[in-house]
């Protein structure tokens, strides 16, 4: 797992954009190309290895694959919970199998119902669970600490990042500290792009004491399951989330004065 992922320079409409390549945290073979894994591993540090860990992995998510590997490294038995379907990624299941995890199949249903079923199963069987969307202070602090090193070196006017559920982006935004900076005479702006409800993201940020008029949440016109496979990005970029954020930046870059950093959380396989 590569912790010190690079910041690269990429061109967008004859403009230089800094790109944090957190997708390079995993190699796409042993681990998924995903910048969340250092934070997830920080959560595992505080688990009791005597008890198994179960996690619900929805189709398209790399969480089950990542946890199967990270838990194996820490001697924690991992149970991969999922609802089988014709479209569920066999590639991801096979990657998890390579790490000798156990599988717990569920009947397909709404996400909230599936999560409650897994939670009930865990309580009955003395099995550990991680917070939904990894929403825990240890996870967010890990992201913040890693981002601190980035923003010490790269003083930018705009941070562009996929909102996701609001959890991962919140740790990075806390580090960036948007708004007026009296020392540099700047007004740093955050632009997060969501595929869901804008107010949901603002509420998540508010729950983590992040509230600023310098945070702008925009909803993409593309649906969640539109992977934008025909849209070209100059680096590996996840179609579910990050690709939509880069497309947003391509449409809006002329309105953003100053230096821009795009935080790429996930690549593609």
Q: Can you say where each PLM-predicted feature lies in the sequence?
A:
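PLP-dependent amino-acid enzyme catalytic core
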Residues: 1-269
């Amino acid at each position: 797992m590569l912790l010190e992922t690079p910041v690269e320079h990429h061109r967008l409409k004859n403009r230089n954009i800094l790109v944090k390549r957190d997708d390079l945290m995993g190699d796409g073979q042993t681990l998924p190309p995903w910048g969340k894994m250092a934070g997830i591993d920080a959560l595992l540090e505080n688990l009791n290895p005597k008890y198994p860990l179960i996690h619900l992995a929805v189709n398209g998510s790399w969480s089950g694959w990542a946890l199967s590997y990270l838990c194996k490294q820490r001697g924690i038995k991992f149970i991969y919970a999922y609802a089988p379907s014709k479209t569920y990624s066999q590639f991801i299941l096979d990657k998890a199998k390579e790490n000798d995890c156990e599988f717990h199949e569920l009947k397909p249903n709404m996400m909230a119902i599936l999560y409650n079923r897994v939670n009930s199963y865990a309580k009955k069987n003395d099995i550990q669970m991680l917070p939904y969307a990894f929403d825990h202070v240890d996870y967010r602090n890990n992201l913040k600490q890693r981002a601190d090193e980035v923003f010490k070196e790269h003083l930018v006017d705009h941070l562009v990042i996929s909102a996701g559920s609001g959890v991962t982006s919140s740790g990075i935004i806390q580090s960036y500290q948007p708004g007026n900076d009296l020392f540099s005479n700047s007004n740093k702006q955050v632009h997060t792009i969501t595929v869901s409800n804008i107010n949901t993201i603002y509420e998540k940020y508010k729950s983590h004491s992040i509230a600023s008029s310098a945070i702008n949440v925009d909803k993409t016109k593309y649906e969640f399951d539109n992977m934008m496979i025909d849209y070209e990005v100059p680096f590996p970029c996840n179609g579910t989330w990050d690709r939509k954020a880069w497309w947003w930046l391509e449409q809006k870059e002329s309105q953003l004065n100053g230096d821009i950093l795009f935080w790429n959380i996930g690549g593609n396989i």
